[in-house]
Design a protein with these regions (language model features):
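FAD-binding glycine-rich core of flavoenzymes that anchor FAD
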Residues: 64-165
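N-terminal flexible segment immediately upstream of the FAD-binding catalytic core
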Residues: 1-72, 88-119
């Protein structure tokens, strides 16, 4: 393994490939992409004891096509992907030890369907639990999971967050 590579769980990450991937993402998404240090720091801060490690760039996804296109590009270059919701990160999951692309899902915050009789709701990953419960208030339904912070549904799902309720 060269100085330009990192390995974890049998996967090798090449810094040159990651930089090429980030360049391609930047070209494709333009203003939806940022590689500013302050934005990258905001997207790597965790509530754990571990030191934050920054992604190489952040994509502010607006829809599932943005996510799909970014994932395809990252796959071509074997570039790590770090999904980002609200960013409370009690689990340290937004840390980027190998760099890569943080995909911010906050703009994907629509409640798509409420099937009251079936007790079923379809949401985008950026919807927060407070947003969902406000929307459901007049239906007699509520989302009982409460991890303490106003976490996104996508973040809660990805980390199995359950809270105290």
């Amino acid at each position: 393994m060269s100085d330009n590579e990192s390995q974890w769980l049998g996967k090798t990450y090449n810094k040159k490939n990651i930089q090429e991937c980030i360049s391609k993402i930047k070209d494709k998404f333009g203003q939806q992409f940022s590689d500013s240090k302050s934005i990258r720091e905001q997207h790597s801060h965790t509530m754990t004891i571990h030191e934050s490690e920054l992604p190489d760039g952040v994509l502010f996804a607006s829809n599932k096509n943005d996510v799909s296109d970014a994932v395809k590009i990252c796959n071509d270059f074997r570039c790590p992907i770090i999904p980002f919701g609200v960013g409370s990160s009690f689990e340290g999951h937004v840390n980027a030890p190998f760099g890569g692309l943080s995909i911010d899902l906050n703009n994907m915050n629509e409640i798509l369907n409420v099937y009251q009789d079936d007790l079923l709701v379809t949401v985008q990953p950026g919807v927060t639990r407070e947003q969902l419960n406000t929307h459901l208030r007049d239906t007699g339904l509520f989302f009982p999971i409460d991890p303490g912070a106003n976490a996104s549904i996508g973040g809660m799902s990805s980390t199995r967050a359950s809270g105290t309720n």
